[in-house]
Regions:
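C-terminal peripheral helix-coil segments that are non-catalytic and often amphipathic
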Residues: 1-6, 93, 130, 134-142, ...
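Short, amphipathic alpha-helix enriched in basic
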Residues: 10-34
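HTH DNA-binding helix-turn interface
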Residues: 24-29, 47-59
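Central "turn" residue of the DNA-binding helix-turn-helix
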Residues: 39-40, 51
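Hydrophobic alpha-helical connector segments
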Residues: 59, 72-101, 154-158
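Amphipathic alpha-helical segments used for helix-helix packing
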Residues: 96-119
Length: 190
């Protein structure tokens, strides 16, 4: 009788992103070649799957931001605009206090980090706008809220307001202030 050898399934691009997420959460800078080696794939394959470090970091942050948004919406208290503002407050507080994210912002130069998280060319901002737009549209269609502009425009305004106050230290030398962000959002949503 022949002995069966169990083989590990071949790694996939998703495995690389999952491994990168674990490294990011430990507060480590992502190194595509090192991650590829850890996963048992060639450097060329790792770069083909991930792009460069900046692209991979953006994918990881986008995946974390997506999950955070869903959780904040689910946990939001209140009705109507209060519910929207509670979800926004929860998201901003989480991002401001998430040590691996703050480590990333402190480690990278401001231009690089903003290009990843607060630019139309990065993966995070377009995702955030899309998620906000979909949620706002659902709330409008269900009659829970009324907006003075279309859901896309409001989503864009809310995301950019969040960025302005969450990253105030990086982009304007101001102190981060979540309460001010929520106050401005309240004015936008009236």
């Amino acid at each position: 009788m022949a002995m069966q050898v169990k083989t590990r399934p071949a790694p996939t691009p998703d495995d690389l992103v999952d491994l990168a997420r674990r490294h990011f959460i430990r507060g480590e800078r992502l190194d595509v070649a090192g991650l590829g080696e850890e996963l048992g794939i060639s450097r060329a394959t790792a770069y083909r799957w991930a792009g460069n470090e900046e692209t991979l970091t953006g994918r990881v942050i986008a995946s974390l931001a997506e999950a955070t948004f869903r959780r904040c919406v689910k946990e939001a208290r209140g009705k109507g605009l209060d519910k929207v503002l509670d979800a926004e407050r929860r998201g901003l507080r989480y991002m401001a206090s998430f040590a691996p994210y703050r480590a990333f912002l402190e480690r990278e130069d401001a231009m690089t980090s903003m290009r990843i998280v607060a630019s139309k060319d990065g993966p995070v901002q377009p995702l955030q706008i899309r998620q906000h737009e979909e949620w706002l549209r659902e709330l409008v269609e269900s009659g829970e809220i009324e907006l003075s502009v279309d859901p896309h425009t409001m989503a864009y305004a809310l995301v950019r307001t969040a960025e302005a106050f969450l990253y105030a230290d990086l982009i304007a030398g101001e102190d981060m202030d979540i309460d001010k962000a929520i106050a401005v959002m309240r004015l936008l949503l009236r």
